[in-house]
């Protein structure tokens, strides 16, 4: 009987762990490599590019044609809604990919289709060199 209980507990732990991993992966947006991101943003008819870094970071260098909405601003969602169309996907990036992943989650909740740059502009710059 103890073997059955232990087996049931182990099975329950595996099921919960698998669910947690799947929930983490299914964030509502896609994260892509710099190479794939470059292909995606080339289609400006269907994609809009969003930089969610600070103004200072943006001014130090950004991907051409990127709109700026600072993720740390108190009204990020309002600014994003004012600048972005829900008719086009949003390709989002930041410095390292963390901020843009958080921004992507917020944008998905607002109804946008979102593509996140894995590794941010740092990975983008490494891929271009």
Predicted regions and their residues:
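Rhodanese-like catalytic fold shared by cysteine-dependent sulfurtransferases
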Residues: 2-40, 47, 55-89, 98-129
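Short, surface-exposed ligand- or partner-binding patches at beta-edge/loop junctions that are enriched
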Residues: 93
């Amino acid at each position: 009987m103890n073997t059955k209980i232990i087996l049931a507990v182990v099975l329950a732990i595996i099921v919960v762990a698998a669910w947690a991993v799947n929930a983490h992966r299914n964030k509502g947006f896609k994260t892509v490599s710099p190479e794939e991101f470059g292909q995606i943003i080339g289609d400006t008819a269907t994609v809009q590019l969003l930089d969610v870094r600070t103004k200072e970071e943006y001014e130090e260098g950004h991907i051409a044609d990127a709109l700026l909405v600072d993720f740390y601003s108190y009204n990020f969602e309002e600014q994003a809604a004012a600048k972005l169309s829900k008719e086009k996907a949003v390709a989002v990036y930041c410095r390292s990919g963390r901020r843009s992943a958080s921004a992507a989650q917020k944008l998905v909740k607002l109804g946008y289709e979102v593509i996140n740059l894995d590794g941010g502009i740092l990975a983008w710059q490494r891929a271009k060199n």
